[in-house]
Design a protein with these regions (language model features):
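Helix-start/capping segments and mature chain N-termini
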Residues: 1-76, 93-257
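Long amphipathic N-terminal alpha/beta scaffold segment
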Residues: 78-96
Length: 257
């Protein structure tokens, strides 16, 4: 169960506070960022906000001064005196902007992936059509489990993260049909070449490692797949990718907004 520190909603046209609405299931977009430390830092903040603005325009949310207003609400709701280790979510539709902060869950070392036949709607954008994914996740202890989204017998991503797989000392990711998150995009530039490949469920046994990458989880190694024979054979590339992300975290500066 997520523990929320903050849940606020505002009318987009005048920033007047209204009753909180998480906006799930509606026509709109969102982003989730990791906020941490005192005098808060937000990992990949600029990229998250720019991508949110770009996605909002694609969804017809063309509010004047949108970025400026987002910053105004963040200044109002975040404190330099508080030590954070939370996930900051900003969601938008044409009328409402919602901001929430929930505690970042500590992921167990032996994460299990549970495969479900499900595909994100319009995966090129981080949109709010997310209720089916949330329903599946609500039935699990998300510190120990995640769901692997399967479409046409191919593994695309998880309910929370992008997915990387390792075979013969090469890193692979699905070709298409998934949302490419900000953490994934950043690490993709820093890692050895990532080969694009359709990841069929019946070929998972060929891979030595399955690694999840996302804002909420960071970098996590999957230990096994529920009701599947696949089990982790190595941690080599998990360790490599973790070091790359740790380097990015160390470079993260206090946010000035």
């Amino acid at each position: 169960m997520a523990i929320f520190l903050l849940k606020k909603s505002y009318q987009l046209n005048n920033l007047k506070e209204i009753k909180f609405n998480d906006l799930w299931g509606g026509h709109g977009v969102f982003t989730t960022m990791w906020i941490f430390d005192k005098s808060f830092k937000i990992l990949f903040f600029k990229d998250h906000i720019n991508n949110l603005i770009k996605s909002a325009k694609a969804y017809g949310i063309n509010t004047k001064n949108l970025k400026k207003n987002i910053f105004k609400l963040l200044r109002k709701n975040l404190s330099n005196s508080k030590k954070y280790n939370h996930l900051l979510r900003i969601a938008l539709n044409k009328k409402v902007i919602s901001i929430s902060l929930r505690s970042k869950i500590k992921i167990k070392n032996n994460l299990v992936l549970k495969l479900v036949k499900l595909k994100r709607q319009k995966p090129e954008y981080k949109n709010l059509k997310y209720k089916e994914i949330l329903l599946h996740l609500s039935k699990l202890d998300t510190s120990k489990f995640d769901i692997g989204l399967i479409s046409n017998k191919k593994l695309l991503e998880t309910g929370t993260s992008n997915i990387l797989l390792v075979k013969d000392k090469k890193i692979y990711s699905p070709i298409k049909g998934f949302y490419k998150g900000i953490t994934f995009r950043t690490l993709e530039k820093k890692l050895p070449k990532i080969h694009k490949k359709n990841i069929y469920v019946n070929q998972l046994h060929e891979f030595d490692e399955i690694i999840l990458v996302g804002s909420g989880k960071g970098v996590v190694s999957v230990s096994k797949i529920y009701e599947n024979s696949w089990k982790r054979k190595s941690l080599n590339y998990y360790n490599l990718i973790s070091k790359v992300l740790s380097s990015e975290i160390k470079k993260c500066k206090k946010i000035s907004i």
